[in-house]
């Protein structure tokens, strides 16, 4: 039935054909729909009868009309009969095919007239009845709100006002350009709902259109996707909001705790000040009492001496008035002795008096304490420490790091972090990656020695100063361990070689005493060799060999399994740089490659990178690269030396030179 109904549907109104016209192209069209097409082609004040042609909406064939116009076209009576029978066979009810569009229009008008439409803009409760619905705004207004929102001036004069419509979505089903037409397609170009007339004869006829179902599915899918994202984002925001609220609560609790702590600490300071005030005040009172008591005693003594002296002075003055010589002589001697005794005794009775002890030297100076009180503030994280690279020391497996801090008194502890440095580009990434660092916590001093490091390796160090308020880290400092130190092994030396100078020098010595045979000793007549006393199986190592006049020697490395009766480099288990008078070669597995070092090569540097499989030789004094063996080392290797004349001296345990301590760029 649905397939049959689609065949009986008008391409313009999308309803069952009513009074169908049979077009010359064999398609059918409602009479009223054909008339609307002609009306849409008319210019202003132009009669419909003046239009003599139009296009079939189905096949776009041009239909030419006679003088009779649409009446000149035949009625499709057969099709009308089929439609009538189809309507009778269908189930009657709302929206059924048997229900004509006039009946549905009547029912819609009845429903519209019966249903009350309220103003959607009113602030009143309840809202007033709407008098108009603005199709442009898609809002129904009462008279008062309409006047307030749609004054008689542009752009509001262009708004389309219609009678109030109960449901706002109904107005979206009607075409804005053709008021009596329902929208049944979507203009993709203008992103707008349109009717069939808009596509046939309107401004959308050359636009890209799509079926409503297609656009519906696409927009619905897009809306669902956006809605999912919005819901997800909203959930994230709700989680964030909960965390923000929790953070606010923590701020409130912590602030209250800190305020209470501040009051408690200030009360303690005030209590200490009051205690010190009482103690110092007591000292002042005691000092005052002691001084006043001493001064009172001195005053009493002075008064007593003055009283005694006054009586004696009176008697002496009375005696001096005596004119009778005999009487004067009788009393003068006694008085003179008493005056002399009183003068002498006054010096004894009157103690030494310090008139400067007026308590003015008792000074109070709280300027330092005042400055400290003025600086009272909440605790902040300590300043970043500074690594003192010039004070740091290293061995082949340890590094001692020294640092300083501007505010040591506020630091509770230090934390030392370190990791292997693999290139300048990785410093930032390493600083941001906590997993890459070895950490030594709870250091109380300004230095620390790290043990168990790889020899000949550069490390990055950072020091973190910590207190209750937080922590701050120093700038990264780069320090490196020295190479593995070693000496020559006398037990491995050929019997015609002499090892001396603390086993650091080897020289040809025909007069050497007979040495006992050992498995590790070089024995061949031409292989005058000696090995180092270490076997290296990891890390980077650098040592130098001083050429002391020798013109025939070989310097290199060998596996423990290398034959002791062959020259180094003559087998697959050894690698060597050799000089035979004026011929310079590098040799491995009996293959020789000539090289051209400086004419007077005095010191050879050897850089072994075991993990990356390289053995490099350098002119150590001139920092010139000579040659590099690239080899995957499978066993521990031992430094090995051969000398046929004069002597060689080794210098080991050196740090790798800076110009070599990077990714090598070989010529």
UniProtKB/Swiss-Prot annotation:
Residue ranges of the COS domain?
Answer: 320-379
Chain intervals annotated as zinc finger (B box-type): 116-165, 172-212
Question: Any idea of its EC number?
Answer: 2.3.2.27
Key words of the record: Coiled coil, Cytoplasm, Cytoskeleton, Metal-binding, Microtubule, Phosphoprotein, Repeat, Transferase, Ubl conjugation pathway, Zinc, Zinc-finger
Record: residues binding Zn(2+) 3: 175, 178, 198, 204
Residues bound to Zn(2+) 2 are: 134, 137, 150, 159
Recorded coiled-coil stretches: 205-264
Tell me which Gene Ontology terms the entry assigns under biological process.
regulation of microtubule cytoskeleton organization
B30.2/SPRY domain location: 482-659
Which reactions appear under catalytic activity for this entry? S-ubiquitinyl-[E2 ubiquitin-conjugating enzyme]-L-cysteine + [acceptor protein]-L-lysine = [E2 ubiquitin-conjugating enzyme]-L-cysteine + N(6)-ubiquitinyl-[acceptor protein]-L-lysine
List, in alphabetical order, the Gene Ontology terms for molecular function in this entry: transferase activity; zinc ion binding
Q: Which SMART domains match?
A: BBC, BBOX, FN3, RING, SPRY
Task: Indicate whether Cell membrane appears among the record's keywords.
Answer: no
**PANTHER family membership:** E3 UBIQUITIN-PROTEIN LIGASE MIDLINE-1, E3 UBIQUITIN-PROTEIN LIGASE TRIM36-RELATED
> What name does UniProt use for this protein?
E3 ubiquitin-protein ligase Midline-1
Which species is this record about? Answer: Mus spretus
* The organism's taxonomic lineage, starting at the top: Eukaryota, Metazoa, Chordata, Craniata, Vertebrata
What gene is this protein a product of?
Mid1
